Regions:
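Mid-to-C-terminal alpha-helical segments outside catalytic/metal-binding sites
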Residues: 3, 239-240, 255-300
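Mid-domain alpha/beta scaffold segments of enzyme catalytic cores
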Residues: 1-143, 151
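Family-specific functional microsites
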Residues: 252
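A generic structural motif
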Residues: 215-219, 244-246, 278-285
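Active-site beta-loop-alpha junctions enriched in small/polar residues
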Residues: 30, 48-54, 104-108, 164-166, ...
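Short hydrophobic/aromatic-enriched beta-strand-loop microsegments
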Residues: 45, 211-216
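Histidine/acidic residue-rich metal-binding segments in metalloenzymes
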Residues: 78-103, 110-211, 225-243, 260-261, ...
Length: 300
């Protein structure tokens, strides 16, 4: 039955549009960053920038086997021009329809991006390739991350940051504190709410107006964690910021992810109504905001 369904070219869009009732999907085509999957009527791209963090050396490939040169062409070999080149690509992708930037470096490194000087960051371009150290690479990547935060603010593009799961060491949300604090005009979307280190999320959303908690993937990872985050964010009056996404590959997974989140959200709201914390009208308003209004306001 599954095989038969997949033979129908209309199956995928039917599930997404008619079963999931999606009106717009923010898509991350990391194998071809910034693409709308050829379906602009439903998919709106986020532009993943991870490849640009490989620009300290020619010929590098990421863990998916994709190279910076193959996707974006030859790049400058000095820091000021390189940063400007990255900005040019971001502007180009925004003009082509991208509504957000995304960084998922937590799969490759920690999320503590110290602020470094241009002199420290450009050393990676000055030394022989054989002499490049891990410290040189880190300085370059840290510098670029801060510049991207500035560009995101300048171009009014939310910056989605994968947090939590990945290479695990120091990928919790608090590692981003210095960057978020120093870039108040940049909208930071904290994907996955830092799971499993959820407690980091709450002081950040309470302390910074430019932080947006996104429960993408969380209900699939842990129904209990999803419930807990929703309970606490509602009690902290963060209702206007909460977003959700499926973070899946297949339409079956997307539908299942939606069911999981609906179940979690309804469970939490039912408990809040029974406790007298919310009215039914309040709960309906929260549903509209989390499943539609907040994302529309943030991205579109």
């Amino acid at each position: 039955q599954i095989s038969k369904a997949h033979q129908n070219p209309a199956f995928y869009m039917d599930v997404l549009k008619n079963k999931c009732k999606y009106q717009n999907i923010i898509v991350d085509t990391y194998w071809n960053p910034g693409s709308d999957n050829g379906r602009p009527e439903l998919f709106t791209p986020s532009f993943r920038l991870d490849l640009f963090f490989l620009g300290y050396k020619k010929g590098l490939r990421n863990h998916d086997g994709v190279s910076l040169e193959e996707r974006f062409g030859e790049f400058p070999d000095n820091l000021p021009d390189y940063v400007e080149w990255v900005k040019t690509w971001i502007i180009r992708k925004k003009n082509a329809g991208c509504v957000a930037l995304k960084i998922a470096l937590a799969y490759e490194r920690d999320l503590h991006f110290e602020q470094v000087t241009q002199e420290q960051a450009e050393r990676v371009f000055r030394v022989k390739e054989s002499d490049i150290t891990q410290e040189d690479i880190r300085y370059f990547q840290n510098y670029l991350f801060w510049k991207i935060c500035e560009i995101a603010a300048e171009l009014s593009l939310p910056l989605q940051c994968h947090t939590g799961m990945g290479q695990i060491t120091n990928t919790n949300i608090l590692q981003l504190n210095n960057v978020i604090k120093s870039n108040p005009e940049t909208k930071f979307v904290l994907l996955h709410c830092g799971f499993p280190w959820l407690d980091d999320l709450f002081p950040m959303v309470d302390g910074y107006q430019n932080v947006y908690p996104d429960l993408t993937w969380v209900p699939l990872l842990s129904y209990t964690a999803s419930n807990r985050v929703l309970h606490q964010l509602i009690e902290m009056s963060q209702i206007d910021k909460i977003c959700w996404g499926c973070d899946t590959w297949t339409v079956e997974e997307s539908y299942g992810s939606l069911l999981a989140f609906r179940f979690s959200l309804c469970k939490v709201l039912t408990e809040k109504i029974e406790d007298g914390y919310l009215s039914v009208s309040n709960a309906k308003d929260i549903i509209d905001k989390i499943l539609f209004d907040n994302a529309e306001k943030l991205y579109l």
